[in-house]
């Protein structure tokens, strides 16, 4: 009997932890239905993933996939209009000119995330997190700007 009660307690604890993790991000951010629906319509594969939501500059950002849960990061307006998707990529997939720029201007820099960005107009760019800032490059790897 003690074993059954012990197992029940352990299973309850594990299921509570799992439930809390599934709702992580939703407790702090109330995502409009229009935004959730837009994400499911545009990226139906995300339905099978654990999605975390956050707000950024008045918009909503859905994150899912990969080890850190942020292999895909999609931004929508509050009305559910697609703004952009950032897909995590390895550094070696950056255009050569972007890599060259980074080596020249950010010697011994600490790299963070590297992503390929596709915006609502179909324009591709790249962003590289370096020393806590986003360094933006165009589709050819030419430096565009640095964002905080």
What are these regions (language model features)?
Residues 1-23:
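Bacterial Sec-dependent N-terminal signal peptides
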């Amino acid at each position: 009997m003690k074993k059954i009660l012990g197992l029940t307690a352990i299973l309850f604890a594990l299921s509570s932890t799992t439930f809390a993790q599934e709702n992580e991000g939703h407790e702090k951010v109330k995502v409009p239905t229009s935004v959730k629906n837009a994400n499911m319509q545009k990226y139906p594969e995300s339905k099978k993933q654990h999605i975390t939501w956050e707000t950024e500059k008045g918009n909503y950002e859905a994150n899912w996939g990969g080890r850190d849960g942020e292999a895909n990061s999609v931004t929508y307006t509050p009305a559910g209009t697609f703004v952009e998707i950032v897909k995590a990529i390895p550094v070696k997939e950056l255009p050569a000119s972007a890599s060259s720029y980074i080596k020249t201007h950010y010697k011994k820099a600490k790299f963070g995330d590297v992503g390929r960005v596709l915006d609502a107009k179909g324009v591709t760019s790249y962003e590289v997190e370096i020393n806590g800032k986003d360094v933006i490059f165009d589709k050819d790897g030419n430096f565009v700007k640095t964002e905080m």
